[in-house]
Amino acid sequence: MHWTLAGNLAEVLAALEAAAASGAEGCVCTELALTGFHRRLPELLDPAALAAAEAQLRAACARLGIAAAVGMPTLGEGGAVFNSHAYIDASGREVGRVHKRGLTASEASFFTPGGARGWTVLGGLLATSVLCREMLDVAALLPELAAVPAGSEGLPRVVFWPSYIGASDAEQAALCRAYVDGAEMLARELGAWVLQSNWPEGLNLPGPQGFGASVVIAPDGRRVAVLPRDAAALQRVDIG
């Protein structure tokens, strides 16, 4: 994570390059990957700079022939700022966004909560996103994810889980376990893969804080992979 838009954009572009080089057809990035999730975020909300960064992401996806789901702020009307996960297809076209609704108290002092979410067809998958602590809200999410777009019933379902969570102490470790329990339940109930992309570090509190350790959960609720803790990593997942 970096304090600047340029630094974080470079990291996302490098991740897309690495994913494409591995033969992947898509890449899932973290919560607010484009800006970083830190106390200087309000300084990075210049509309022109954000638009230029998003244009670079779309161009990279088109050049590499890879789809991406990338966390970024969305600037709305009346000064609203949403914490969003944006979907870009392999032609470089944005095909959807999910705005985080289940905000923490501190997030709610800055971000505007999103509304109901649905599914988006992305790279031959039926995708949606559950952002960070929203994995505690599975009971509320299931009804709005019950319906799928017409004609997409046979596509594999994938829930992207961009996050910024760390098991920094016993209380936070217990909370992280509750998040994963929610993710496993969501996978089973929807028959969907859950792909977490958690930040491997934070800037507000330097040093190891128990970040990373992203999980891959199969549609039957089994945890099939756990990435390294407090370290950046790329995991290829084959979804059929």
Predicted stretch roles:
Residues 50-69, 136-229:
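CN hydrolase (nitrilase-like) catalytic-core segments centered on the catalytic cysteine
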Residues 102-104, 229-233:
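A short acidic/small-residue loop/turn micro-motif
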Residues 112-114, 208, 231:
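Residues that act as N-cap/strand-start positions at coil-to-secondary-structure junctions
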Residues 5, 9-90, 165-192:
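Cys-nucleophile CN-hydrolase/nitrilase-fold catalytic domain and related Cys-dependent amidase chemistry
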Residues 70-72, 84-87, 118-119, 212-216, ...:
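Short beta-strand scaffold segments in enzyme catalytic cores
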Residues 1-2:
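Generic N-terminal amphipathic, Lys/Arg-enriched alpha-helix
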Residues 76-157, 162, 171-181, 239-240:
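Active-site catalytic loop in hydrolytic enzyme cores
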